[in-house]
């Protein structure tokens, strides 16, 4: 960019921009935020705003674009949503009083991970994640700047780091080390994350006390440093650092959560049709966030699960009190976000009114909880801090009709401050005084249309038309001359005006100071407000789960220590809700101590995947503490769920369905324990038939012999059902069908034993394929089944049988000497000693095709 003959103002812009090269710089100039040079060109395209130039007649005009300061937030939101950073430079002094260039400074850098204000507020968390690496393990810290939530853990490998970032749905990742090229590709290209870097650890360790590893400390410290550097203020709302271990929760990868539609429907990317949608009867934004967290991280502690169950049971048993509780929670605003706005110095009168309204509801909520008269609920009661003194301050100080801005006045209630009341009285009575002066002068002067007007330039004045100029009294003095009239003042009017203007200015200044003082007082309560927010959120989620349990007739699950799964008449909770109770066909699921694998066969569209997902959702809901969709449930506590359900290529990373399958299978067999749950649907379908079958069998055997996890393996390879004869912990089940007069009905019920056929052509018929095509497919199927039966009787003869056949002049098996010679040559070329089992299977398959 050409920067010759730069003005002092533009030099100031360039000096500031130099410190923020990776951000759009919004440069406050009067009522606009201006952008220049490359920022202006790019922003004009992204924001669809006009592009002009600052010095149009210069040899090298400076590109310029701007947005009004009062609507800047909506433009900032667009840039942040697109993954950019925005640095906001404000005027630090009154331009009218400035000597030379107005002093400007960047007051905040807004990034995708540090959004606090938004024109489109979202109740969901917005986590900023920091990752550090010590050469052995990874430290991962995350924070929601808008709520103050702050957590840290350590992880063994980059795969775990990736999964945790995905689970947190982060948009920005802060790194304290250099990534490999492959890792960079994963985070930037595959996960579409903004990467930021920080080398410095925050000096103040008060927020990160605790028994942490070195890499956890550096990850948390660098995260704190970055947040303070971008927000440029003390963040009193940040909560004490919480250390957590992945193993403390039911572990699930992002792919598993996606395939089970836990927080959003995988097909629509919407909340509707997800478990989150089903369970969400929360009344507060805080409750919504906490519910999502519970779904993301079910518990593995039986004691903690039973504690949640007990409270839900108490709520279920008291319909009237629970209804009152739900209604009271509707009056609770987002305390966490309001606290952060106070901490950031951005809380306006409406924010404080919302906080006050919430605090006014708390005593009612506490009284309702006390009425349940239950020891488990009493723990929640004891955690509720009503903060009556803060509620009183807001109620008596802030006018209930106060505007959303602090510059318009009318914020503070009458009676709160004597000086403010005096100034308001002067302004109120001054209006009456002016009316009295107007009436008196009209009568004394004889000017019947004499009136007093006001504008900013001339203040209060008498308006006299030219036709009445001869009647103007001597004590009037001229203030302005117009074409058809003149404006006059009097000493009395000037005195009243002075008193009113002084009162207005003093009132405005005093009211602002009072509000800032009140906001500072509110800030001292932030820690107590955050604790209250957590308790109210917990109450909200528990009442939500109680409402859902009652509405859908869910039951309280039991847990055992002997690895037994018993689900009687279980339902897929989400599918049932979408279809309706009358339409849904329940299924029982049973694994005794000896059974670790169910091999399920059956037609497409018959309900195999739903059966598998039903088990997963039942486990997740149970370990959340929720009641579940069944007549009776008794489960072991699982430590992890691994799934491969549904075929999909990973187009961004260029991985095929088969590769994705193998990678997910690898994660399962490497990480699963005998306390895990594995759900594999049609594994191996992305490759050749015999390859797929060989891999499927090998994986089943590996899980059976080495892992021992409870597993449901759905397959179309009917040959695999024979594994039940040699794998003692494997049982066959199938989806029952009813075949009559050529028509097939899928019963959607699981029965013991293997399926007899797949009914693929019948599914094609349902899909509406042409009759001629279906007829041809039936012919081909009959032929293939005949060939299959004929080849099944061919077995490898023993060495004795072979020699006897030669002596007796046995006829050629192939009936074709030329083909026999071809096969003999192929056999002789095989290096048996150096073949892998998979190569041997493939070669055998190729030889079979020669028959």
Curated annotation (Swiss-Prot):
Taxonomic lineage is:
Bacteria, Bacillati, Bacillota, Bacilli, Lactobacillales
GN (gene name): mutS
Pfam families from the UniProt entry: MutS_I, MutS_II, MutS_III, MutS_IV, MutS_V
Organism field: Streptococcus pyogenes serotype M49 (strain NZ131)
User: Do you know which HAMAP family this protein is assigned to?
Assistant: MutS
Q: Name one GO molecular function term.
A: mismatched DNA binding
Write the protein's name: DNA mismatch repair protein MutS
* Biological role stated in the UniProt entry: This protein is involved in the repair of mismatches in DNA. It is possible that it carries out the mismatch recognition step. This protein has a weak ATPase activity.
Gene3D superfamilies for the chain: 1.10.1420.10, DNA repair protein MutS, domain I, MutS, connector domain, P-loop containing nucleotide triphosphate hydrolases
The portions of this protein that span the membrane are none
Q: Keywords in alphabetical order, please.
A: ATP-binding, DNA damage, DNA repair, DNA-binding, Nucleotide-binding
